[in-house]
Amino acid sequence: MRYISIDSAQPGMIVGKSIYNEQGSILVNYRVKLTERLISRMRDIGLAGLYIEDELSSDITVEDLISDELGVKATKALTKLDIDAALKVASDITEELSLNGDINVNLISMRTNSDYTYKHSVNVAVLSVLTGIGIGLKKSILKELSAAGLLHDIGKLNLPLDLLEKAGPLSEEEYKTMKTHSELGYERLKENINISSKTKMGVYMHHENVNGSGYPLGLRGDQIYMFAKIIHIADVYDCLLYTSDAADDLTRV
């Protein structure tokens, strides 16, 4: 099994992994044979790529870091703005990753325009927890970090859908609106007694840069909470898997 871009998809290819929407329903089933119509439909919904099975990759098995079931639960929780369910999923992500002794990162998830934010948030949670494991954080802290990673973009759900799904560059005014999402996310979470202050600060500060060029507060260096630094790096790294737009951000992290 191997991952290909949607532009490389050809009729007759066999789908290697099922493709889900944000509700957890299957859009394209495992082992379905691609047709021109199906490929066209995938392009229409903004699918960047997919896994296929062929002779070149018949002996390759792609193991996900977290189960499809857990990924679907995370997406559903975020779609429904079910914070309690999201916290449970964040804890489960930490448990699954803690049990995974062989940390070979496979973060290629098949995303459409409508579910990009949700699947991106899952990947940021995974990358953040892996980073936390690498620097020796204890499990209770990892769970708080996982929650911050999973919820870091929850403020975007207050923004217009056409802004979130815009394919081209944002205008100055649109970018100004987009930058409000970290504050909106914090406002949504700040009164929730089930969410730690560490998690809330991770969400609030995840676009701060060590040189002071970030937002919303323009903090520098050690003024930025550790969770936010980890999430920012995970955020940019995951974006780079799907778009070059994040490359400029990486130089400022």
Task: Pin down the residues of each PLM region.
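Histidine/acidic-rich helix-loop-helix segments that form or flank divalent-metal centers
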Residues: 149, 189-192, 196-228
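Membrane-cytosol interface segments
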Residues: 1-88
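Acidic/His-rich, divalent-metal-binding segments that scaffold phosphate/diphosphate chemistry
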Residues: 53-179, 184-198
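Conserved beta-strand-loop-short alpha-helix elements that form
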Residues: 229-241
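Thr-Gly-centered strand-to-loop micro-motif
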Residues: 29, 173, 240
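Single conserved hydrophobic/aromatic residue that forms the stacking wall/gate
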Residues: 242-253
